[in-house]
Amino acid sequence: MSLLTRLCKGNVPLRLNTLKHLSQCGYSSHAKFSEHKPIEKIRNIGISAHIDSGKTTLTERILFYTGRIAEMHEVRGKDNVGATMDSMELERQRGITIQSAATYTLWKDTNINIIDTPGHVDFTVEVERALRVLDGAVLVLCAVGGVQSQTLTVNRQMKRYNVPCLAFINKLDRLGSNPYRVLSQMRSKMNHNAAFIQLPIGVESNCKGIVDLVQEKAIYFEGDHGMDIRLDEIPQDMRAESGERRQELIEHLSNADEKFGELFLEEKPFTEKDIKEALRRTCIQRTFTPVLVGTALKNKGVQPLLDAVLDYLPNPGEVENLAFIEHEGKEPEKVVLNPARDGKDPFMGLAFKLEAGRFGQLTYLRCYQGVLRKGDNIFNARTNKKVRIARLVRLHSNQMEDVNEVFAGDIFALFGVDCASGDTFTTNPKNHLAMESIFVPEPVVSMAIKPNNTKDRDNFSKAIARFTKEDPTFHFHFDNDVKETLVSGMGELHLEIYAQRMEREYGCPVTLGKPKVAFRETLVGPCEFDYLHKKQSGGSGQYARIIGIMEPLPPSQNTLLEFVDETVGTNVPKQFIPGVEKGYREMAERGMLSGHKLSGIRFRLQDGGHHIVDSSELAFMLAAHGAIKEVFQNGSWQILEPIMLVEVTAPEEFQGAVMGHLSKRHGIITGTEGTEGWFTVYAEVPLNDMFGYAGELRSSTQGKGEFTMEYSRYSPCLPEVQEQIVRQYQESQGVGQAEKKKKKN
């Protein structure tokens, strides 16, 4: 019995439009997705933006218009269903996206793989992972908020991975929306060569449709959910502005594209085809950013955005993807991967995300070269472990669909593969190729954590093991001195979300302590060492001598630790060098000034001595311990603290109070701007001074102010702050003040 007959027999009131939508572009079209498509018919895109710019709502509309879902739900809708891509219960409750969700859909016979990413700065590694494996992105901007702090972060990440992007100015229906201001911010703050390819026909409550500057047509979205598109002439009152903006678009394109520039200089008329080809070339080369407009919530502008994804963003064959062959002591050799979907070259894939699913660990991969079929064997390039492919799946948020094979350009997932995020997989282990891994920022906040009930310890350790494996920015360690379990992450929200997930997913309620800043210790200047470790206790003893220098790294590398072997000859036999490095890295875990990790230091081993019988790797490891203690006594040390980029937005009448509070917290104001009764201030503030700021800002701005912050860098802290940290550490260690009069710089 057909679906239609069954529904009618049950006297279910039907809306013919819904059925029409289901039958036309629903299930049948997605059977076509699994057909083997040529590379030109594939797009891998991400949807990224600042928090609350409407990314998830936009993805929901895209899935609806392409027939992937039969009805739409809002992020914070009254029906409590939540958006399709926010599959975690916590995401639906808070109305924010925490994890990247992957899905696929079909538009005009082209496969589109979409990853919806979080906008909150605490989940920035999710964005980092998504952009690493995508060929193009849609950067969503709020027509009211414009370019905000996380927009700048996403922009930097896109630049790092060379991802071409389209800009979509969303929320035209919001009070105070001003897409023209957003465009000028894109040019000034993000240095984008950007211009409108669409204009809004009215904003706020008067938002009627859009003008397409390429086709020179007005587009209106009618019928249920804006599904019927009507093309019309440009309204009379917008013709002058449309002409000016089209000319501006042509000028920007002629500056960015040589071929188009020649046509411009020859003053030949431009066809729609000329403009589209120039837009595609410049967008792929990242020399121009096309700007589209719309309102996802009010169902306007989404279908033209999908057309733009097909027209202007690259297919996997138009993006150069590299793998590297490591050579000891030399620069890695670059190898360009073949994106052809013919399976002639061996399979190469990158694991970009891990997740604990219902059936074991789920590993998300992007196939860059070759073909992978069920039953194939693949090898992990890092561990050389062989894995047999029992099941290949394609993802739609938290649902999955089995497939028999995947080709270059596809995004898919595997079950039961033991690996880390950023691992490379190949069917030919002899080629020694590895793909560049994913950049992972250092955690900046730590909190003590403990289960409320001792009987939950097993579940607690299971949760910690899973979350640390899934998220490389979530760290865990046990502090022996204070006998506390510590978790570290990118911010308070990051750690709170994991605490709530432990209770929700593992039935293990936990208590979080006060946030602690991840300080670091570093040297101020170079310090030489010459240390002899000698121990005789009958039988074979221990003998090791090491000579060298410990020196600070440049400020841009002050979160790193380096070990350099500069020895010549056999005074320190090569088999003992790893022992010295191990000793150095062990000691770097805990500094002697404040108990924090050492960083920004290079350990140069230059010479030493050994004994034919008594020397061992252990002896050289202990010699490294002694050498670092010697450098601690003789060298000058300082404490580094994380500096945050803070952006505060509030009504203009509170500007003085906001600036005063930031200065009181040792903030350095880097810029301000104001518009329509509101101002935004940008500052660099030590993270240690930012705790409790949310409450202070609320009370000083009558609840109207809001702020965002993200990690910027590590920087030396003020002398009085260093003194206080050292004193607190000494008191916690029970060291008398009289005994510790020695002051460190």
Curated annotation (Swiss-Prot):
Domain tr-type G residues, every copy: 40-317
GO molecular function: GTP binding; GTPase activity; translation elongation factor activity
Binding locations of GTP: 49-56, 116-120, 170-173
InterPro entries: EFG_II (IPR041095), EFG_III (IPR009022), EFG_III/V (IPR035647), EFG_IV (IPR047872), EFG_V (IPR035649), EFG_V-like (IPR000640), EFTu-like_2 (IPR004161), G_TR_CS (IPR031157)
Cellular localization per UniProt: Mitochondrion
SMART domains attached to this UniProt entry: EFG_C (SM00838), EFG_IV (SM00889)
Pathway(s) where this gene product acts: Protein biosynthesis; polypeptide chain elongation
Keyword Nucleotidyltransferase: no
GO biological process: mitochondrial translational elongation
SUPFAM superfamilies: EF-G C-terminal domain-like (SSF54980), P-loop containing nucleoside triphosphate hydrolases (SSF52540), Ribosomal protein S5 domain 2-like (SSF54211), Translation proteins (SSF50447)
Pfam families named among the record's database cross-references: EFG_C, EFG_III, EFG_IV, GTP_EFTU, GTP_EFTU_D2
Keyword Protein biosynthesis appears in the UniProt entry: yes
GO CC, any one term: nucleus
Keywords on record: Elongation factor, GTP-binding, Mitochondrion, Nucleotide-binding, Protein biosynthesis
Miscellaneous remark of the record: This protein may be expected to contain an N-terminal transit peptide but none has been predicted.
Task performed by this protein: Mitochondrial GTPase that catalyzes the GTP-dependent ribosomal translocation step during translation elongation. During this step, the ribosome changes from the pre-translocational (PRE) to the post-translocational (POST) state as the newly formed A-site-bound peptidyl-tRNA and P-site-bound deacylated tRNA move to the P and E sites, respectively. Catalyzes the coordinated movement of the two tRNA molecules, the mRNA and conformational changes in the ribosome.
PANTHER family: ELONGATION FACTOR G, MITOCHONDRIAL
Protein name: Elongation factor G, mitochondrial
The organism of origin for this protein: Drosophila willistoni
